[in-house]
Swiss-Prot record:
Segments traversing the membrane: 87-107, 116-135, 236-256
One GO CC term on file: membrane
Entry's localization field: Host membrane
PANTHER family associated with the record: CHLORIDE CHANNEL CLIC-LIKE PROTEIN 1
Lineage of origin: Viruses, Duplodnaviria, Heunggongvirae, Peploviricota, Herviviricetes
Membrane topology: Multi-pass membrane protein
Transmembrane helix listed as a keyword: yes
Name of the protein described by the UniProt record: Putative transmembrane protein ORF57
Keywords: Host membrane, Membrane, Transmembrane, Transmembrane helix
Gene Ontology MF terms: chloride channel activity
Highest rank taxon of the organism: Viruses
Amino acid sequence: MTDAVKKIAKLVVDLHGEKNTQNIIEVAKAGGKESAEAVLFKKLTDAIIKDMTAMINHGDSKEKMQFTSTEQDLPMAEDTTLTNNKLFWFSVVVGIVLFVTAINYLLDKVCWIKAARKIAITCFLISVCWNYINIYEKTMAKRYMVIRQGIPGGCMERGADWSTVLRTMFKTLMITHSDSNDECLQYAKSIIVEPLFEVTPTTALATTISDLILVPINLAAKSCNNVFRTVFEGVPVFMIPILVFLLVYISTLCIISTKRYTISVPFLLELKPCLVEPPPMVPISVRNETCNVVHKKPVALRRGLCYNKLFRNKKY
């Protein structure tokens, strides 16, 4: 028996769990036509396949256990997220109720015009600070990007060759430069100038005022654009001028009719001031009677009025 056969038999014993190596060798010798090495090699491969299938089955069972555990944990995670969402919305509702209660109490104690004025001034000051921080952060981002790109290629450095010097001189003499187009100056400013001093409070104030005026106009213009787009959607191109004329005509008539003008349309339009009829004249007898009734006063009251007039007109 060779050493190879003994080693294979030992491996088979280790894999199959057999207790006696000699029994395996005898079984291998009694294999008939096949040699002992071939029989033992088959047994070895069978043992390896058996162990591999067992390992695979064990891994599948572990994955199934992990999957079932994750499936069991999922409802718990969903429950925690639901509870967190409920707490968040509950806190939001409580905050809104407290805010409305405080506003109602303040409006009962203070004049609502003064309260609205104070709230508007406070919001304006907060917006100024907000815009200042926003502009400062944007300036910092621009400065970071300029520094990150490095020194521009056209800028002269110490130890530059003659080609760089001549190119820079040619650009300086032949090409007009401005401060906004000068890359070297922009790079130097981004390194030296602090953004805190570049962004001034007046800039934030002007930005806030312009936003206060222009942002509502911008939103109104966008809304009008959407309205006209929906009105003219699906209308042929040659019908659009007619529709615009009709809209302008109808809106003009509505505006003018509120100003007490008469509108006649023999040739599409004619404007005249509205003729207002005067009220009917009251008969003279009725007017005299009403005047007598109105001006008839008690004697004591008339005397008092006379005395008051005398003392008022008398000069001492």
